[in-house]
Amino acid sequence: MSILFYVIFLAYLRGIQGNNMDQRSLPEDSLNSLIIKLIQADILKNKLSKQMVDVKENYQSTLPKAEAPREPEQGEATRSEFQPMIATDTELLRQQRRYNSPRVLLSDSTPLEPPPLYLMEDYVGNPVVTNRTSPRRKRYAEHKSHRGEYSVCDSESLWVTDKSSAIDIRGHQVTVLGEIKTGNSPVKQYFYETRCKEARPVKNGCRGIDDKHWNSQCKTSQTYVRALTSENNKLVGWRWIRIDTSCVCALSRKIGRT
């Protein structure tokens, strides 16, 4: 198409030159040479374009075909920072350093001592290994022997070994992973929890509270820790869950008292 355009254009120019009697016309051989050069240039351009297309197709054919990402099916949960339960691997355990909480322990054996940050609490050993932990129970309770010092509420701390469910930070019920398979030996998840021994350590409520003006009661308080959990038995990951962490005295003013 471009060659035909060049020929028509040159014929048009030659016709103009023929009508112009005052201007000397171009020599015949010069005009023919110009036409030949234009045709050769157009042929060369088309040839180079075709070669570039062939090279590009050959290069793409040699590249390995990338697998297209699979579209999630309807009703299938998309993967975020949580993994399917069947894919629980060491990568999740490596994240424990980032999500570490002193009250959560992943271990292949039952812990016999409280975490270092909670050595002064009233630690209660695992009932299964009571004989082994009885000296420790005595040692960790020595701080209560100070004269003149009494706790408003009596608390106890222990490693919970059978936690199966919890409430996460969104208020959803999640399943706590009790055992995680990693390599040769599986590890279990333990939670160091603190709770009240009783709601009323004395007759009228909390110890040392003026019962004439106040109603008092010991209540277990909760806070959030990171733990390996699953939701709807599908997605496994580190979530914030609530566990018992302290015992506090709750007060309310008696009606009619000022």
Swiss-Prot record:
It is found in: Secreted. GO terms for molecular function: chemoattractant activity; growth factor activity; nerve growth factor binding; nerve growth factor receptor binding. It comes from the Eukaryota. It holds the Pfam family NTF3_N. Residues 60-85 are annotated as: Disordered. Brain and peripheral tissues. Residues 1-18 form the signal peptide. The keyword Membrane does not apply. Keywords: Cleavage on pair of basic residues, Disulfide bond, Glycoprotein, Growth factor, Secreted, Signal. Residues 19-139 form a propeptide. One of its GO terms (cellular component) is cytoplasmic vesicle. Disulfide bonds join C153-C218, C196-C247, C206-C249. GO terms for biological process: axon guidance; brain development; cell surface receptor protein tyrosine kinase signaling pathway; enteric nervous system development; epidermis development; generation of neurons; glial cell fate determination; induction of positive chemotaxis. InterPro entries: Cystine-knot_cytokine, Nerve_growth_factor-like, Nerve_growth_factor-rel, Nerve_growth_factor_CS, Neurotrophin-3, NTF3_N. Its main location: secreted. Residues 67-79 have a biased composition (Basic and acidic residues). Glycans are attached at N131. SMART domains: NGF (SM00140). Belongs to the NGF-beta family. This is Neurotrophin-3. It comes from Rattus norvegicus. The lineage of its organism: Eukaryota, Metazoa, Chordata, Craniata, Vertebrata.
